């Protein structure tokens, strides 16, 4: 046991890593929660069962590539219905999408007080809780995460034709996702068995 740690005491390794990287000059931009409805069962009886993991968005500079539109979420049906109901010109959001500022003509009512569906927003900025269930993987790597998780990160953080680096490549989920999105990838893995798994799973490339 690490010196200074107590039995049953959370060490907080994800946050320790995030703070260490920030101290090294990185910018900690977001703490994203990966929420799972089908998490790994736990036998604990003196605390809640864990059903999430942290994903930290870290950058090397204040300005960086981030494609918010590529991972935008569809707006809820109730939100769309409220837009279609229309608002009077005196409403505080008459010419504004809440949270996005003024947009020319986007919310101005037409005759009868309804919005033009062609101008109505259909998506919103992605939130920082991502509900992505785990998926079964029959290979020998027990901690493989779902491709959709990697795909979301790649779409937001890597332009088309860019290169994705995974320094803990494991069974190659990141490479699989990158290849499916027409990105190149570099995977680093110490375990030779995992390298073999990744190569067979991806089916080619530079793994």
What are the residue ranges of the model-derived segments?
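Core catalytic lobe of class I
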Residues: 1-207
């Amino acid at each position: 046991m690490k010196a200074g740690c107590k039995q049953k005491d959370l060490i907080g390794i994800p946050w320790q890593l995030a703070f260490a990287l920030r101290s090294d000059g990185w910018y900690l931009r977001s703490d994203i929660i990966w929420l799972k409805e089908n998490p790994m069962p736990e036998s604990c009886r003196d605390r809640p069962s864990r059903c999430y993991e942290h994903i930290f968005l870290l950058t090397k500079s204040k300005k960086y590539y981030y494609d918010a539109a590529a991972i935008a979420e569809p707006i809820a049906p109730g939100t769309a219905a409220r837009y279609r109901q229309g608002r009077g010109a005196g409403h505080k959001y008459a010419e504004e999408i809440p949270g996005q500022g003024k947009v020319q003509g986007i919310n101005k009512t037409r005759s009868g007080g309804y919005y033009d569906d062609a101008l109505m927003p259909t998506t919103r900025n992605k939130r920082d809780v991502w509900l992505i269930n785990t998926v079964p993987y029959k290979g020998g790597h027990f901690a493989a995460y779902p491709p959709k998780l990697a795909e979301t990160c790649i779409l937001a953080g890597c332009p088309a034709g860019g290169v994705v680096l995974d320094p803990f490549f494991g069974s190659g989920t990141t490479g699989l996702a990158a290849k499916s999105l027409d990105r190149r990838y570099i995977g680093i893995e110490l375990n030779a068995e995992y390298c073999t798994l990744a190569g067979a799973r991806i089916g080619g490339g530079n793994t």
